[in-house]
Design a protein with these regions (language model features):
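TPR alpha-solenoid repeat register
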Residues: 27, 61, 65, 99, ...
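Residue-level detector of the short coil/turn that links helix A to helix B
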Residues: 5, 39, 77, 111-112, ...
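Canonical tetratricopeptide repeat
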Residues: 30, 64, 68, 102, ...
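Residue-level recognition of tetratricopeptide repeat
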Residues: 33, 71, 105-106, 140, ...
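Structural marker of alpha-solenoid helical repeat scaffolds
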Residues: 20, 54-58, 92, 127, ...
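Position-specific recognition of the canonical hydrophobic site in helix A of tetratricopeptide repeat
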Residues: 2, 36, 67, 74, ...
């Protein structure tokens, strides 16, 4: 459900379903996921909380509500609550690979609990070893753990396994190459990343102009 028309159809279907099954949790998933994708976070949270209250304890759908609430909270910068939701998801469904990936990546961005992050993304990769998103996350966890040579291997694999690599992948690869001493190649990757980025790219432009990451000591 990444296409706008699909999310619209899902949202409308959820509203229709809710008319007939107001006490079932499924319609609330159908409504809240499109809202989450559209970043209508408060409305998504409202439906998720209603659906969560209707979900049987320790059920797969309850785990799903916890996971989506975690995403809402994280996007609202309510990090502790987000991570508590992800922990609740994984207590019910330890093999939820999307939660394992996202939780791991968020921890790496905050440079927190990197051992836990590595275990989670390793589990996700075991289930889907050619998933470029998971490979990117694993590479980034390794990068934050200062395991630069292994990070390079996994980031290269992430790019090779993605038909249309994003600017984020190339930027990550540039950062990793830089820390492996390959500064010229790093700048090339940052330049390539800039071609794919539409939003504000101040940090990326700094890297290209100065030949080093923003927080790197000269």
């Amino acid at each position: 459900y990444n296409q706008l028309e699909d999310t619209t159809a899902m949202y409308r279907g959820g509203l229709e379903c809710l008319k007939y099954f107001p006490n079932e949790p499924l319609p609330y998933v159908m409504i809240s996921l499109p809202l989450l994708i559209r970043k209508d976070l408060e409305r998504a949270k409202g439906y998720l909380e209603q659906g969560l209250a209707l979900s049987p304890d320790n059920s797969p759908i309850k785990a799903q509500f916890f996971a989506y609430l975690g995403e809402v909270y994280y996007k609202q910068d309510r990090v502790e609550q987000a991570f508590a939701m992800f922990d609740s998801t994984l207590l019910i469904n330890p093999g939820d690979i999307m939660t394992l990936n996202n939780y791991s990546y968020y921890l790496s961005l905050r440079n927190e609990h990197l051992d836990k992050a590595e275990k989670m993304i390793s589990t996700a990769l075991s289930a889907d070893p050619n998933n470029s998103t998971f490979l990117d996350t694993y590479a980034w966890v390794l990068f934050k753990s200062k395991n630069y040579s292994l990070a390079k291997f996994y980031m290269r694999s992430a790019i090779e396994n993605e038909k249309n690599p994003s600017g984020v992948l190339y930027e990550h690869y540039g950062d990793i190459l830089f820390m492996n001493g390959e500064k010229e190649e790093a700048v090339k990757m940052w330049q390539k990343a800039l071609e794919f980025r539409d939003e504000e790219c101040g940090d990326l432009k700094y890297k290209i102009e100065n030949g080093l990451p923003v927080d790197h000591e000269k």
